[in-house]
């Protein structure tokens, strides 16, 4: 099967790590162009050293390159505002081009590979939510397939050192996009997301806490569902793991808790603690937050490439 050529817009931490993953591990993908806006960026310099074509003139520079004619999939690792403009420009030049959005822009549907990749594989634009969303939404979905989830809250703690200018510029969009995706993909009636930039030295690994309030159900069934989901995520993010056993608390009907936007709740509270260790392809091992984004985007693109190849075969 011939590989599909891809371009990455954004030569920062995420874009560079993703490029290295594609060059080393791409099964159905061929790294064609790295796009940036800073001619002095380390990402563009590294791409050139690795034999990848580059431009420092942004999406316009990409569209003016001869390589653009053969590109089927574009990853956007810029910012939410920039992605809206990039999508419009690329769509006008190539209506059928596939975009994988690693910003919180969310023009297309949210995609969390282990939960809903199959139903989104033929979309022209998919959004990879956020690092916190990729880590925690599978856990919410794991509870949702056993019991009705009324509320889910996630706290993502990431090393301050791993948060580049793009991440910092998108903090508000991070919380909004993650909260919405907890509902749309995770299956919660109400979702809430909090991000913490931890300045500790040496930097700590990404840690995530997930609280899920659901109807009462078998605790064994919920724990089994969570463990099964964690294994599925590990297939494309090897450093993803449960930090400790799942914990439960029954909230009795005569002592309900009051949830903003939900009302009074009684039922089962499930608490999950996660840790994500990065693969250290370009970034340090503590930057699991960036690794889970690039790994999820890579898994999505691989499936898209297979789908495009099948369609090309059917049309031939």
Swiss-Prot record:
- EC main class here is oxidoreductase
Is Membrane found in the keyword set? no
InterPro entries tied to this protein: Acetaldehyde_dehydrogenase, Acetylaldehyde_DH_C, NAD(P)-bd_dom_sf, Semialdehyde_DH_NAD-bd
Signal peptide feature range:
none
* Enzyme Commission numbers on file: 1.2.1.10
> Could you name the active-site residues?
131
> Belongs to which family?
Belongs to the acetaldehyde dehydrogenase family.
* Subunit organization: Interacts with MhpE.
Q: What does this protein do?
A: Catalyzes the conversion of acetaldehyde to acetyl-CoA, using NAD(+) and coenzyme A. Is the final enzyme in the meta-cleavage pathway for the degradation of aromatic compounds.
Supply the name of the protein: Acetaldehyde dehydrogenase
Q: From which organism does this entry originate? A: Escherichia coli O81 (strain ED1a)
Source organism phylogeny: Bacteria, Pseudomonadati, Pseudomonadota, Gammaproteobacteria, Enterobacterales
Q: Which gene encodes it?
A: mhpF
């Amino acid at each position: 099967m011939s590989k599909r050529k891809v371009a990455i817009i954004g030569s920062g931490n995420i874009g560079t790590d993703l490029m290295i993953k594609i060059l080393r591990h791409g099964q159905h993908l061929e790294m064609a162009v790295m796009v940036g806006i800073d001619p002095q960026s380390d990402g563009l310099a590294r791409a050139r050293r690795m034999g990848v074509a580059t431009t420092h003139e942004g999406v316009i520079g990409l569209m003016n390159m001869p390589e653009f004619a053969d590109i089927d999939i574009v990853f956007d690792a810029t910012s939410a505002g920039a992605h809206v403009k990039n999508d419009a420009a690329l769509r006008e030049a190539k209506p059928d081009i596939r975009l994988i959005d690693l910003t919180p822009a969310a023009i297309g549907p949210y995609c969390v590979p282990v939960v809903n990749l199959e139903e989104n594989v033929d979309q022209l634009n998919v959004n990879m939510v956020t690092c916190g969303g990729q880590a925690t939404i599978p856990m919410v979905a794991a509870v949702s397939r056993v019991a009705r989830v009324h509320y889910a809250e996630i706290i993502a703690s990431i090393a301050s050192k791993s948060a580049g200018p793009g991440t910092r510029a998108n903090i508000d969009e991070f919380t909004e996009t993650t909260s919405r995706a907890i509902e749309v993909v995770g299956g919660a009636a109400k979702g809430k997301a909090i991000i913490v930039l931890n300045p500790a030295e040496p930097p700590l690994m990404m840690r995530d806490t997930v609280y899920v309030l659901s109807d009462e159900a078998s605790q064994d069934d919920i724990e089994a569902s969570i463990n099964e989901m964690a294994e599925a995520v590990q297939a494309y993010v090897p450093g993803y793991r449960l930090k400790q056993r799942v914990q439960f608390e029954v909230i009795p009907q005569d002592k309900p808790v009051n949830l903003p936007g939900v009302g009074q709740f009684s039922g089962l509270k499930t608490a999950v603690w996660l840790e994500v260790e990065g693969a250290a392809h370009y970034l340090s091992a503590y930057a699991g937050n960036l690794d889970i984004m690039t790994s999820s985007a890579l898994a999505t693109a691989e499936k898209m490439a297979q789908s495009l190849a099948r369609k090309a075969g059917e049309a031939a």
